Structure formats: C-alpha cells, structure tokens
Amino acid sequence: DYLKMQKELYLFIIWQNGRFMEKQIIADLRKKFEIFRIFEVSWKEENFALNLARFYGKKLPKGCKKEKETGAGAFKVCLVYDNNPQYADGKNANIVKSKQDYRQLTGGGNLVHASDNLAETNENLLFLFGKTVKDLEQEGPRAEICVVRRDLVGCPVWDSLQQALDTVRKIPFTRVKAYKNSYLIHSRNADLARRLLNASSHFSIPGIHKYSIEVGKTRQPIYIRKIN
C-alpha cells in the first residue's frame, strides 16, 4: 500500500452549452470524487474567444470552432479531490475516463474540460483566477457556489507590472529578476510563462527572448529565458 498516492486536486469545466447536463455531471463527480469548490465564471463576450485560445494554448482541439461550440455564457468550474489518483502516461486515468464520459453525455463534443494532472490543475487555476492549487487549498473548501465575473488574468491587459510579475512567479521553477530597465523571467516552464503573461514576441537573442506585455495603456518589454 506504500504506493498509494496522496489525494490531488483536479478541475472540471462544464462550458455553457454543456450545462443542460450539469446536475447529472455534478452528481457523478460527488459519487466519484470529493467536491472542494464550485465556481460559476462569466467572461466578457467580446473577450471570450481570446480567453479560450489562451486558456487552451496549443491544446485547442483541432477543427473545433471552439467558442461556437462551447457557448460564450457563464460556465461551471468544479474543483474536486481524487483520493486515489491512478496515473498512466502522466495523466490521471480516473479523471480522463470521467471527462470522456461527460463529453459523451453532452453529445460527444468538447463541452467538458478537465485537467489531466496536478500540473495542469495548477496551470488552469493560474489562468482562471491568478491562484495556485496551494493558494486555493489555503482558502479551504466552501459549500456555496462562488460567482466570478472576470476574464482570465491579464485580459485584455494587466492592471500593473507588479500584478503580471506576481502572477508569473506562481509558476513552478520560475524566478524574476531586474534586467536592462526591465525584468528577466527564468523559468523551466518558459512557454507557460509567455502564455500566462500574454506576451508577444519581439526578437530573440540566443537563449533569451524579448517580449512585450500590455500593462494599462502601455507596452512593457520583458525578457524570458528557459532554464533546464
């Protein structure tokens, strides 16, 4: 029994067009997992496509007219504990199976999203709320549904440079230091740092890539370097 995993936090999203099966899905989640928190999130309609593309990154399902498919209205985010994760190929098979079941239940498309492993839960939470798994665990479970009306972090722009840096620092194995009147972000997860910052590329010096991010009404240069 020494191989028994510690319980881990996972995230399911029921997009607007899948919510006709919400009661059945949440009832099934309660049976299989331990419900930690449920959020109802709304994004501004004009930012929905941007938010979605950024949330999925390169993983936007192929040939999926994503926003038309998901619907651009309020969606449910269910955070659950799996008390006995079963890993295969870096993914928790319990979660993958449930996600596939719920996608079938909602008509076979991409109307339900789930994080495949703890790292993806963390990434999803950073984009949605600017918080890590640890941050949410420290806040503790809540019975009531939490209503959140806001876009992904840094959408359409960051409120301040400090907000952007504080958020990117939450990525594992990431450091921020002053560099050339700006900041250099060293990260093992450099691509995630770029996506989270919503940074657009300028040019690259070997090993260091210069980007810019939108802060208020200005563009701020920022450097990102991948470390191993």
Q: Model-found features: residue ranges?
A:
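Non-catalytic terminal and connector segments of soluble metabolic enzymes
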Residues: 1-152
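Short acidic donor-binding/metal-coordinating loop in glycosyltransferase active sites
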Residues: 16-17, 181-183
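Short Gly/Ser/Thr- and Asp/Glu-enriched loop/turn motifs at secondary-structure junctions
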Residues: 73, 107-109, 177-181, 208-210
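A generic structural signal for alpha->beta connector loops
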Residues: 32-35, 170-173, 202
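Generic detector of bulky aromatic hydrophobic side chains
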Residues: 93-96, 134, 175, 185-189
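Catalytic core of pol beta-like nucleotidyltransferases
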Residues: 139-165, 172, 178, 185-228
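A residue-level structural signature of the nucleotidyltransferase/glycosyltransferase Rossmann-like core
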Residues: 113, 184-185
